[in-house]
C-alpha cells in the first residue's frame, strides 16, 4: 500500500487546478458545516477539491463538487453521500462582498483548500477571474524562467 503524502501545516486538500485556471483577486476563510463521518474522513485525509466551486444562493454560500470519501468503518445507519452540497459559514459582510463581485461579469468564487484550524475544518475560498489560454501560457513561462534563475543562482553559489 502506498504511503499518503503529508500536507503542510494541517492542510487536508488543495485545489491546484483553480490556481492554474484563475487569477486570484481576494481570499476568504469559511467554516464548513459537516457531518460526523465527514470529519473522520477528513482526519484520514480523504478529500478532493478538484472540480469544486462555491454557489451563492439566497444569501448563503454552498460548496459544490467537493468529494469526501467515506471510511469503510463509517456507521451503517447513516447513508454517506460523498459529493453532497456543504454549507459554508461566512460573516454577512463577507457574503455581501462575494455576492457583489460575482454579479459582475467575469468573476467566480472557487474553493482553494481545506485545512484544520485548531479542531475546526476551514475552507479557503477565493474571488477569482478566469484566465484565458494565453494567460496560462504566460504564467507557465514566468514560472519556468524563475526556476531557471533559481537554478543559476544555486550553481553560482557552488563555485
From Swiss-Prot:
PROSITE patterns per record: SSRP
Stretch list, region Disordered: 132-159
Subcellular localization: Cytoplasm
GO molecular function annotations of the record: RNA binding
Coiled coil: none
Disulfide bonds: none
A GO CC annotation given for this chain: cytosol
Family from the record: Belongs to the SmpB family.
Known role: Required for rescue of stalled ribosomes mediated by trans-translation. Binds to transfer-messenger RNA (tmRNA), required for stable association of tmRNA with ribosomes. tmRNA and SmpB together mimic tRNA shape, replacing the anticodon stem-loop with SmpB. tmRNA is encoded by the ssrA gene; the 2 termini fold to resemble tRNA(Ala) and it encodes a 'tag peptide', a short internal open reading frame. During trans-translation Ala-aminoacylated tmRNA acts like a tRNA, entering the A-site of stalled ribosomes, displacing the stalled mRNA.
Record's protein name: SsrA-binding protein
Organism per entry: Pseudomonas aeruginosa (strain ATCC 15692 / DSM 22644 / CIP 104116 / JCM 14847 / LMG 12228 / 1C / PRS 101 / PAO1)
Amino acid at each position: 500500500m502506498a504511503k499518503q503524502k503529508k500536507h503542510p501545516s494541517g492542510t487536508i486538500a488543495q485545489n491546484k487546478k483553480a490556481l492554474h485556471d484563475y487569477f486570484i483577486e481576494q481570499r476568504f476563510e469559511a467554516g464548513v458545516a459537516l457531518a460526523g463521518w465527514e470529519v473522520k474522513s477528513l482526519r484520514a485525509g480523504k478529500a478532493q477539491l478538484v472540480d469544486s466551486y462555491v454557489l451563492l444562493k439566497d444569501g448563503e454560500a454552498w460548496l459544490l463538487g467537493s468529494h469526501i470519501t467515506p471510511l469503510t468503518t463509517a456507521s451503517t445507519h447513516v447513508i454517506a453521500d460523498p459529493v453532497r452540497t456543504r454549507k459554508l459559514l461566512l460573516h454577512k459582510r463577507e457574503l455581501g462582498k462575494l455576492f457583489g463581485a460575482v454579479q459582475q461579469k467575469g468573476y467566480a468564487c472557487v474553493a482553494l483548500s481545506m485545512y484544520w484550524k485548531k479542531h475546526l475544518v476551514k475552507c479557503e475560498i477565493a474571488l477569482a477571474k478566469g484566465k484565458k489560454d494565453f494567460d496560462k501560457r504566460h504564467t507557465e513561462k514566468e514560472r519556468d524562467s524563475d526556476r531557471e534563475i533559481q537554478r543559476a543562482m544555486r550553481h553560482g553559489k557552488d563555485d
